[in-house]
Amino acid sequence: RPQRVNMAEYSCLIVEDSPMMRQLLVFALARVKNLRVTEADDGVDGLRKLASARFDIIVTDINMPIMDGLKLVKRVRGDPVHKDTPIVIITTEGSHEDRQRALQLGANAYITKPIQAPQVIATVKELLKIE
């Protein structure tokens, strides 16, 4: 992933079935300069959005109807266009086994709910390599 100049715009796909949690994530990530956020309400909607645009990072819940976040991670890692896109898992599933499974499937970071905005912001900035 090439380094970008200061004013570059980054794009983030948030995949989360809870409207309240989506709103919280959008609000938190609004503090990241030059980050454009797109929302999807489940894994299938997320894949639809991924098919029509490129994203620099994906933030996804695990427990969602239709297609869960782990299946989404698997599908993204199998897609030549997005296979290297950083993925942040945000979930209530906090066990060591759940974390290991998500990371083995290809997630880059794992944050348990309740989320703290500074942690989400720091994780996204770190994965995008922006200040």
Model-predicted regions and their roles:
Residues 64:
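Receiver (REC) domain active-site loop signature in two-component systems and cognate sites
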Residues 115-124:
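C-terminal output helix
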Residues 79, 93-94:
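Short, conserved "switch-loop" micro-motifs in signal-transduction and mechanochemical regulators
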Residues 19-38:
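Two-component/phosphorelay signaling modules centered on CheY-like receiver
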Residues 39-57:
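Acidic, metal-coordinating helix/loop segments flanking the phosphotransfer/catalytic sites
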